[in-house]
Design a protein with these regions (language model features):
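Hydrophobic alpha-helical transmembrane segments
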Residues: 1-169, 177-308
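Glycine-rich phosphate/dinucleotide-binding loop and adjoining beta-alpha-beta core of small-molecule
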Residues: 174
Length: 308
């Protein structure tokens, strides 16, 4: 998918030659093309599964489950974070800083060249919190929408098609959704689509995550404080997801980051809690797994009730 986006980006930039309107239209066409190809690919695979299920339903179900699980990024995110945590735990952490920064650069968008140990840990906490929605809960939500659509007609886009549509929008946003140079116009439509598709999942996470822990205050108050801290973030979704994880994992987030050399100060979240450490990052990862389990059970229960 990344290769297709890069190819289409280069093509659009050559045709537009810096013209803002043409770049914007090119971004719309890139978004439509990549999302359509991803959705139709998922839909075709779903049709094949329906066709072959007649002969071997068990094998088809197992294969279909494997393909669906490929839409979730929880395992790869956990692996990357634990690799960095293990390096941070090393006695001679200062010696490992360059290696830490290099590994961190693969999973964060901020500049990492000058980050110290505490800033690396904060980056891990914030990335785990934000990416849990993009990588786990939003795909699960859109899988559920696909399953729901099948209740009306199994020729409609199902869980795989809907999950791949979301992953396409998320990938476009991660590659083109920047506000500098040509990308300010070329990546606009992809970024907005990703915001729209993540809007509901982020708010469901806000409401359901406190069920996975024992917050120091009433659940309603925890949700309210997370909302108040998160809503001031320029992003309509990442601030909310970071805030609820910050309160549930009892860790402070936010502060100064640099993106391509430009300083960006994000508001402090859960400022009464301590800064990120290894234990708080592990708590965040544990919360993600717990909430993922609750969501899957909830989806299965809703499907069962629909089919009654």
């Amino acid at each position: 998918m990344g290769a297709i986006i890069n190819f289409l980006r280069g093509l659009a930039e050559r045709i537009a030659k810096g013209n803002k309107s043409k770049l914007y239209i090119g971004g719309v066409l890139i978004t439509f093309t990549v999302v359509f190809l991803s959705g139709i690919s998922g839909w075709i695979i779903e049709r094949l599964f329906f066709f072959f299920e007649i002969n071997n339903p068990i094998a088809t179900s197992l294969l279909f489950s494997f393909v669906l699980s490929s839409s979730l990024a929880s395992r790869s995110l956990n692996k990357s974070i634990f690799e960095i945590i293990n390096l941070v735990s090393h006695e001679n952490v200062e010696y490992n800083l360059n290696n830490l920064r290099q590994k961190l650069s693969f999973i964060v968008g901020r500049d990492v060249d000058n980050l110290n140990k505490n800033e690396i840990l904060r980056a891990l906490a914030e990335t785990a919190s934000e990416n849990s929605v993009d990588g786990v809960f939003a795909p699960l939500f859109w899988m559920f929408i696909g399953i729901f659509l099948w209740q009306f007609n199994n020729l409609m886009p199902g869980p795989l098609a809907m999950a791949w549509i979301f992953k396409a929008s998320s990938t476009i946003d991660s590659m083109l959704g920047y506000k500098d140079g040509n990308l300010k116009w070329l990546g606009f439509s992809g970024a907005k689509l990703d915001d729209i598709m993540t809007w509901i999942p982020a708010r469901i996470v806000l409401i359901t995550l406190p069920l996975c822990c024992r917050p120091k205050q009433p659940i309603i108050k925890t949700i309210q404080q997370a909302w108040e801290d998160g809503i001031v973030d320029p992003s309509p979704n990442s601030g909310i997801s970071e805030a609820i994880f910050a309160y549930c994992a009892e860790v402070r987030m936010g502060g100064v980051n640099f993106y391509k050399g430009k300083k960006k100060t994000k508001p402090l979240i859960a400022k009464s809690y301590p800064i990120a450490n290894i234990n708080s990052i592990k708590r965040i990862l544990n919360l993600i797994l717990r909430l993922q389990f609750i969501w899957v059970l909830g989806i299965l229960l809703i499907i069962k009730l629909i089919n009654l």
